[in-house]
A protein has these predicted regions:
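Structural motif
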Residues: 7-12, 43, 88-90
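Active-site pre-lysine segment of PLP-dependent enzymes
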Residues: 2-5, 16, 21-41, 48-79, ...
Length: 142
């Protein structure tokens, strides 16, 4: 990565498509070190880590990074239902302000009902219980 001159790395560190390979802890730390050198960013597309068969949740680049240089993306279409086409993005604080200033005019295209369903799943604890049930079931089949 050092010799490329790139300033942005887009990665799916957990079960990366199409290989299915998960980045090792040392590789994840290498990504973080690369981003810290200079004005660089990592876009972490974390669309499947919730379904790790490990008993310990996978560490995200966002959680390892002090949240300064990592933009975290995830979706509910893998964890709740493929028909629920809802994703989300978590930005570093300084980018959140810039995003709001430059792109704040965009309106959310997700229907209100779907937003309320997701909010209820999260707030009630049902989402986390669902993830834990699926992970336990997956561990039994492995």
């Amino acid at each position: 990565m050092q010799g490329t001159g790139a300033s942005v790395l887009h990665t799916t560190p957990y079960r990366s498509f199409p290989t299915g390979i998960t980045a090792t802890a040392s590789k994840r730390h290498e990504y973080i070190r690369w981003a810290r050198r200079g004005d660089r960013y990592i876009i972490e597309d974390d669309f499947e880590s919730e379904f790790s068969v490990s008993t310990k949740a996978e560490e995200t680049l966002f959680s390892l990074s002090e949240q300064e240089n990592v933009i975290y993306l995830n979706t509910f279409s893998k964890t709740v239902s493929p028909s629920l086409r809802v994703g989300y993005m978590v930005l570093p604080a300084r980018l959140a302000v810039e995003f709001s200033e430059r792109l704040g005019f965009y309106s959310c295209t997700v229907p209100t009902f779907e937003q309320l369903v997701i909010a209820e799943l999260i707030n009630s604890g049902d989402f986390e219980r669902h993830i834990n049930r699926v992970r336990r079931s997956m561990r039994k089949t492995v």
